[in-house]
Design a protein with these regions (language model features):
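Eukaryote-biased, non-catalytic alpha-solenoid scaffold regions
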Residues: 1-276
């Protein structure tokens, strides 16, 4: 097919971007930075945008395998680049979009990618495979519950997916992983499930305690916030700065309840963290 030919030409470097680099002194001589301008003289952007449109048509027609093959290639693709004098670093899909060489809704593209991936994979492989995409910054900004509203067909086996997704994320470090874990548990198990996970997973994701307190704060449940704060501070590593944030929220809850002794106790924890 034409798409397959374009993919091969890009992979082999037969289709490439021209570049021109220069030193930008617009912020002053000492704050100059090297700027690379890309020139798409071979219409690569148009070809990739055609693939993106075709893949979405495949999703709408329930041809998920065909869509998935294109999406996988798009996110792994590297377009060669060369200046007049030498080869330059290759360019991925996100850099193409940042430099206006393609014009597409990257968030929707990412959600459709995950949707197609979900549809073609066996149930027990979905969470692990889909997580690999989150190395890309576009995916790192997604909210997974949006996945369930992007395609025409309702996704199946969602209970197993959420269980597998939560089991995978709870073992992973990182801010994105913590956010995804929090959102997944709140969506699937609610605030009590989030608190349960915080208790079990304090060493890997201590920020879950803070998320629980934030949720309780929305309902002005200050006694629960106090209790969470006490439990969190008894379990979280004493060197972590998040302890001061937890203690501060707990102190505020105590002040709302006129629990002066507890408020002073939590405030002392905040001061201790600052002075460490």
């Amino acid at each position: 097919t034409q798409i397959q030919k374009w993919k091969e030409l890009i992979d082999e470097g037969e289709l490439y971007l021209d570049t021109e680099g220069y030193e930008d002194y617009s912020n002053g001589y000492w704050d100059s930075e090297w700027v690379t301008e890309y020139y798409d003289n071979q219409g690569i952007g148009d070809k990739i945008q055609y693939m993106i449109r075709f893949a979405e048509d495949c999703v709408n027609d329930r041809r998920y395998q065909a869509a998935n093959e294109i999406y996988e290639w798009l996110w792994e693709m590297e377009v060669s680049a060369a200046s007049e004098y030498e080869e330059e670093d290759s360019v991925d899909l996100e850099i193409l979009e940042e430099n206006n060489l393609i014009h597409t809704d990257m968030k929707r593209l990412a959600l459709l990618t995950l949707y197609a991936d979900y549809q073609v994979l066996p149930a027990n492989e979905r969470a692990k495979d889909m997580y690999l995409y989150f190395a890309c910054s576009t995916f790192a900004k997604l909210h997974m519950e949006e996945l369930f509203h992007v395609g025409r067909e309702e996704l199946k086996d969602t209970e197993q997916f959420w269980e597998d997704w939560i089991d995978l994320l709870k073992e992973k470090n990182g801010d994105t992983e913590a956010r995804l874990l929090k959102e997944a548990i709140l969506y699937y198990k609610g605030i009590d499930g989030l608190y349960e996970m915080a208790e079990k997973n304090a060493s890997v994701h201590p920020s879950l305690y803070l998320s629980v307190m934030e949720q309780y704060e929305k309902g002005h449940l200050y006694e629960k916030i106090e209790k969470v704060g006490e439990n969190a501070l008894s379990k979280i590593d004493g060197n972590l700065t998040i302890r001061s944030k937890i203690a501060l929220r707990a102190a505020f809850a105590s002040s709302c309840l006129n629990h002066e002794e507890k408020m002073m106790h939590f405030a002392g924890r905040v001061l201790f963290q600052i002075l460490q």
